[in-house]
Every structure is written in C-alpha cells, then in structure tokens.
Amino acid sequence: GVRSFGLTWNYANLLADGALETRGAGLTNFGKQVVQELNALHVWTDVSHLNERSFWDVIEIAKNPIASHSNCMKLCEHPRNLNDEQLKALIKKNGMIGVTFVPQFLTNEKQANVADIVRHIEYICSLGGENNIGFGSDFDGIVETVVNVSVYRDYENVMNELCKHYAASTVERFLYDNFVEHMSF
C-alpha cells in the first residue's frame, strides 16, 4: 500500500504551497484534513517540495513526517533544502530525512561528488539525526548526476566513502534500517 504521500510538487495546489510558490501560504484547510487522514492511515506526510510555511503546518499536525528527498540549506542554498530548524523539527518528531543525490541540492559547485553526499549526512548527524537519515536519491527526477553515482547500483560508492567515517552498521542504517524501523509506526 501507500507508505508516503507528497502534498505538492513545488507550486500551489488544493492542498499546500510548494517550495517555488511565490504567494507564501501554507496548508489549505483541505490540506490539513488530508494530513489528518494520513495520520489515521499511518502514512508518512512528505514535506519535500513544500514551502517553509507549509512545512511548519505539517510539523504541527503530522504524526509521521518525512522529507523524502531534501538536503541541508546550511551546506547548499536551494529552495528545496531544509534549514537547521526544519531539520531539528523532523528529528524531534522522529521523522525521516532522505538525503537526495540531486547535484544542485548538494553543492553550489558545477559538479557534485560523493564527498558532497557525505557532507550532508555528516551535518544531519551533527544535529542528532543519525537514526533519521536515509537515501532519497531521486534518480528518476534528474538529468545531471553526482560523479560515480548515477544509478542505484552506484550506492556502493557512497557506502564505501561513508564506511571511512562511520561503522558499517551505521552505514547500513542510513541505507536501509532507519527506513524500515520508521515504517513500523
């Protein structure tokens, strides 16, 4: 069945305003009702693609928030990335944060590499989110890719680099176990 539900894709719709919407509104009344229904159905409410006001509306209502594919604004200013307060709020609510491999969300440099992915993971860990991290690659939504990470089979390259910084069991949590544990809500 459905495990995660995104309320919008970057712009406004009947539920919420997205990250690129200029009017700055949050969840609509209908959007709030949808989040309540997602709670009742034990489905993750995805904050990726929401603007900040919609994000905070979701955090207030949702029992199971997730940022399925978002990174750290502190490391790369992009409207789809999350600021420290948003990341901390997800961690506090025991939500998941799927680090995305979209190059423009990882670095302001011309080309992203595996070290950029690791940098975002390390930063989320520094905020207390080691048990909240997963991979939110978004390969189906991008044309440009991280050097040596263009398909899911290339996860090994990310895992090998992460193993230089973390125990293998922690890397396994990032890759798989954190998501599985969070699915048992």
Which positions does each model-derived feature cover?
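Extended, charged catalytic domains and RNA/DNA-binding interfaces, predominantly
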Residues: 2-100, 104-107, 118, 122-125, ...
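Active-site micro-motifs of SAM-dependent methyltransferase domains
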Residues: 72, 141, 181
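Conserved active-site loop/cleft motifs that coordinate metal ions or position small ligands
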Residues: 98, 132-136, 171-175
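Outer-membrane beta-barrel pore domains
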Residues: 108-111, 142-151, 162-165
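C-terminal functional module detector
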Residues: 112, 119-123, 128-131, 169, ...
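Short acidic/histidine-rich active-site segments
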Residues: 128-150
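Mid-to-C-terminal alpha-helical segments outside catalytic/metal-binding sites
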Residues: 150-185
